[in-house]
């Protein structure tokens, strides 16, 4: 078979001095960082949808890319051609993982029977590709938002027959993920939200999606899937308001339906931007709540109110993200999936490599800086000092429930408490972070 990326053998590490745009300058898979291989820290994945399914179309224009597998033809054969190119790309990019939606890899067909038959054939194709290339599946998911049947959502749809169709897709995609050795299964909100409250029963829709997620958990245990279930928060788009708005909202939902021990979160940087949060905030919140799972590494544009899905290029932003992840013990089943796409004007097929290479170097350099922050320990020391009072007698009595509100008020009066504010030293800490970032 003719190689699609025929001008490239494989992307390799050449070091910081390299000017080769098709080489890594910072990502060295075998380099040890805090005693662990860089590849094992970062667990990079490339996504199927933006990389091989998007044709460059947007709201104002038709497809701009001339991909051979996006031409008219027999759908299943084109899907197999797309898989050939995808795994050529994964291998040459040197990523250990990939991710997909069901209909990214397989034609949907005109019925559930066709959908399942097509998907079963393509799962066999993907299994063979994985065996041949050594590339593994980080996570799979089902696209329950593109087809017009999902215009009013999938699990939150007012029609239980649509709910049932979505359940069929999710079961099939979960089974496929399990068969392919996937390490996680993702549930993104899609169109689980509302356009207007005038035709929406919020309590009803919340009960529906809560039951749907409980059924997903039940099926996971029934099938013996050992991977992690992940919800991906997003505040809006495509609906006006999504029910999985941000990490904290998802945690409240999980608690309500008794799922907080069963499901974690897959955090996307651009979705944090849309929610009015920093990427750092969402990562730290998930870790604090015990539901951190995986990351969709990309970036948004603070001046635009939609999901631009650009490749991450900010070491300043991502060093702090990697710092939080390292302090929490790193990824277990999760990783860094590049949910990012080249720009519509980037029509050269090698632009796909340029985008991913830059992103991988960004995250690798961020990891190394984060490791220096962990090794130095100065930030942690200053935070510990700020909260040191809570390790004292009074602080511990409060936290252990040994003082009531009235007793605490009495204590304050008896001891003539007159606390004085202590500086938070924000500027000092920002300067400290800059030293890690820019001092060699």
UniProtKB/Swiss-Prot annotation:
It comes from the Bacteria. GO terms for biological process: D-xylose metabolic process; L-lyxose metabolic process; rhamnose catabolic process. Disulfide bonds: none annotated. It catalyses: alpha-D-xylose = alpha-D-xylulofuranose. The active site is at 101, 104. Its EC number is 5.3.1.5. InterPro entries: Xyl_isomerase-like_sf, Xylose_isom_bac, Xylose_isomerase. Mg(2+) 2 binds at residues 268, 271, 307, 309. GO terms for molecular function: L-rhamnose isomerase activity; magnesium ion binding; xylose isomerase activity. PROSITE patterns: XYLOSE_ISOMERASE (PS51415). The keyword Metal-binding applies. One of its GO terms (cellular component) is cytoplasm. It is found in: Cytoplasm. Keywords: Carbohydrate metabolism, Cytoplasm, Isomerase, Magnesium, Metal-binding, Xylose metabolism. Mg(2+) 1 binds at residues 232, 268, 296, 339. The keyword Lipid metabolism does not apply. Belongs to the xylose isomerase family. NCBIfam families: PRK05474.1 (NF003998), xylose_isom_A (TIGR02630). Homotetramer. This is Xylose isomerase. It comes from Salmonella typhimurium (strain LT2 / SGSC1412 / ATCC 700720). The lineage of its organism: Bacteria, Pseudomonadati, Pseudomonadota, Gammaproteobacteria, Enterobacterales. The gene is xylA.
């Amino acid at each position: 078979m003719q190689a699609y990326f025929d001008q490239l053998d494989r992307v390799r590490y050449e070091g910081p001095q390299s000017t080769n745009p098709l080489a890594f300058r910072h990502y060295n898979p075998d380099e040890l960082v805090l005693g662990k291989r860089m590849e094992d820290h970062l667990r990079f994945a490339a996504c199927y949808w933006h990389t091989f399914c998007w044709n460059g179309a947007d709201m104002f224009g038709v497809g701009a890319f001339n991909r051979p597998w996006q031409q008219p033809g027999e759908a299943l054969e084109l899907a197999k051609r797309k898989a050939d190119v995808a795994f050529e790309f994964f291998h040459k990019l040197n990523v250990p993982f990939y991710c997909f939606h069901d209909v990214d890899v397989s034609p949907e067909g005109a019925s559930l029977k066709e959908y399942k038959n097509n998907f079963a054939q393509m799962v066999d194709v993907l299994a063979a590709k994985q065996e041949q290339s050594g590339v593994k599946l980080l996570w799979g998911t089902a696209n329950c938002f593109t087809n017009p049947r999902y215009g009013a959502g999938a699990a939150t749809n007012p029609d239980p027959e649509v709910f049932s169709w979505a359940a069929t897709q999710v079961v099939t995609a979960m089974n496929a993920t399990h068969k392919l050795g996937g390490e996680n299964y993702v549930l993104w909100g899609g169109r689980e939200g509302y356009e207007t409250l005038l035709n929406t029963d919020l309590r009803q829709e919340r009960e529906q999606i809560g039951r749907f997620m409980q059924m997903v958990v039940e099926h996971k245990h029934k099938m013996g899937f050992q991977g992690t279930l992940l919800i991906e928060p997003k505040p809006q788009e495509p609906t006006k308001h999504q029910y999985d708005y941000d990490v904290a909202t998802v945690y409240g939902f999980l608690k309500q339906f008794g799922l907080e021990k069963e499901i974690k979160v897959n955090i996307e940087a651009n979705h944090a931007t849309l929610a009015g949060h920093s990427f750092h905030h969402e990562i730290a919140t998930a870790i604090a709540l015990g539901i951190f799972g995986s990351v969709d590494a990309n970036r948004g544009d603070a001046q635009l109110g939609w999901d631009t899905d650009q490749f991450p290029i900010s070491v300043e932003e991502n060093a702090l993200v990697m710092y939080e992840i390292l302090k929490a013990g790193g990824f277990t089943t999760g990783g860094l999936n590049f949910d990012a796409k080249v720009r519509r004007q980037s029509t050269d097929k090698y632009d796909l490599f340029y985008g991913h290479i830059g992103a991988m170097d960004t995250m690798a350099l961020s990891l190394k800086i984060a490791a220096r922050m962990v090794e130095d320990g100065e930030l942690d020391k200053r935070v510990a000092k700020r909260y040191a009072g809570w390790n004292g007698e009074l602080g511990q009595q409060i936290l252990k429930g040994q003082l009531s509100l009235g007793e605490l008020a009495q204590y304050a009066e008896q001891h003539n408490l007159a606390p004085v504010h202590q500086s938070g030293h924000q500027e000092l800490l920002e300067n400290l972070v800059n030293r890690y970032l820019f001092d060699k």
